[in-house]
Amino acid sequence: MNPNQKIICISATGMTLSVVSLLVGIANLGLNIGLHYKVGYTPDVNTPNVNGTNSTTTTIINNNTQNNFTNITNIIQNKNEERTFLNLTKPLCEVNSWHILSKDNAIRIGEDANILVTREPYLSCDPQGCRMFALSQGTTLKGRHANGTIHDRSPFRALVSWEMGQAPSPYNAKIECIGWSSTSCHDGISRMSICMSGPNNNASAVVWYGGRPVTEIPSWAGNILRTQESECVCHKGICPVVMTDGPANNKAATKIIYFKEGKIQKIEELTGTAQHIEECSCYGAKEVIKCICRDNWKGANRPVITIDPDMMTHTSKYLCSKILTDTSRPNDPNNGNCDAPITGGGPDPGVKGFAFLDGENSWLGRTISKDSRSGYEVLKVPNAETNTQSGPITHQIIVNNQNWSGYSGAFIDYWANKECFNPCFYVELIRGRPKESSVLWTSNSIVALCGSRERLGSWSWHDGAEITYFK
């Protein structure tokens, strides 16, 4: 074989080996891609949820050569593993005073940041923690659309939630449902949220569960179908919700609707001696749910609805104590009334409020002013639910009477690792119109406190924004 033939032979052999190597590489790449997509498209029903990833990185430097080794461990959990319905078996914790839990300072921050205009706020917890909720007005404090947000009902309102302690903004708020009245609660497996929307004479409710709309409820009295404006409570999957449709200053039609996974299980007309029900603040303990409400028609004493979620039944009455907790209200009388409203007070027909009724361990919240939504205090009133002579044995200032308050309501972190359910409450700190007409908007910040067995001091947790900075 001459030299030219040798060169041609060697070249041909090299080219053949190169082509074979290229084909092997292509086949290997195709096999890897195919296996990747085969795993990635395995049906969800056969694939456990990947709930988290732990990774650790080790760096070793030898003779100026750096090697990085990363170990990745996937934490695998089957769907609904360790997820069960909340069971309200524990009692309330003993409370001797209240410690601060959260304060969002939304109005102060909103002076130079994009903060949502809200009202009717509350807190609600789930197995992962607690979130703040409110009805947004679809605009920010600095936006021109903030003009006119003193009005309660519009097509632009939505129930939003955000991480506890932050101020609500367009960037951190999650829309739960659309509407101008709401409630929301977690049953241990998923969250149910309810929003009312529509015109006054034909409003409707949409019930969401697990992030999807499940049930729709039409108006039954044609007069502002509305609900609690704070969290509902669930027991063994049953979540009762109090709804009212009808006049705010006369007899209205109230119903207790029992839901499971967003679907109606039973509807009850209001029974008992309560004459008017709005904006109930509910909590659960010892397999009973108690709702402390607002009588916007007659009573300066608050109506109480006691619900048995196992039997899906209820009764209603009035808070027996002579300590009146609605606003406006007359002076505290010498005797309370368990079965009828106590009338009197100024022109303001009422405000949302709360109480925890637990025998000797009972606490009531109210504005300090009898006539307006200013200041806020909580009073320990043993046996307030049953004793017409019961009076306060201690109290704690939450907001001093030189500052505005607003709605208040109950909530509990039912998943906290305690031997009892620790009572918590929030106070809405309203700013802007109508009391502060130099700005165009009406909005709020939130302060929240929880019970303590210790005897802690009082402080004023007022909003703290300088309205003059907004001019």
UniProtKB/Swiss-Prot annotation:
- Transmembrane ranges, per UniProt, are 7-27
Catalyzed reaction equations: Hydrolysis of alpha-(2->3)-, alpha-(2->6)-, alpha-(2->8)- glycosidic linkages of terminal sialic acid residues in oligosaccharides, glycoproteins, glycolipids, colominic acid and synthetic substrates
SUPFAM superfamilies, A to Z? Sialidases
* Known EC number: 3.2.1.18
Task: Give the record's PTM text.
Answer: N-glycosylated.
Per the record, membrane topology reads: Single-pass type II membrane protein
Annotated substrate binding lies at 119, 153, 278-279, 294, 373
> Segment Head of neuraminidase: which positions?
92-471
Q: Which residues lie on this side of the membrane: Intravirion?
A: 1-6
Cofactors needed by this protein, per the record, are: Ca(2+)
Q: Which GO terms describe its molecular function?
A: exo-alpha-sialidase activity; metal ion binding
Q: Which GO terms describe its biological process?
A: carbohydrate metabolic process; viral budding from plasma membrane
**Alphabetically ordered keywords of this record:** Calcium, Disulfide bond, Glycoprotein, Glycosidase, Host cell membrane, Host membrane, Hydrolase, Membrane, Metal-binding, Signal-anchor, Transmembrane, Transmembrane helix, Virion
Q: What does this protein do?
A: Catalyzes the removal of terminal sialic acid residues from viral and cellular glycoconjugates. Cleaves off the terminal sialic acids on the glycosylated HA during virus budding to facilitate virus release. Additionally helps virus spread through the circulation by further removing sialic acids from the cell surface. These cleavages prevent self-aggregation and ensure the efficient spread of the progeny virus from cell to cell. Otherwise, infection would be limited to one round of replication.
Quaternary structure? Homotetramer.
Assigned protein family? Belongs to the glycosyl hydrolase 34 family.
The name this protein goes by in its record: Neuraminidase
Source species: Influenza A virus (strain A/Gull/Minnesota/945/1980 H13N6)
Q: Which gene encodes it?
A: NA
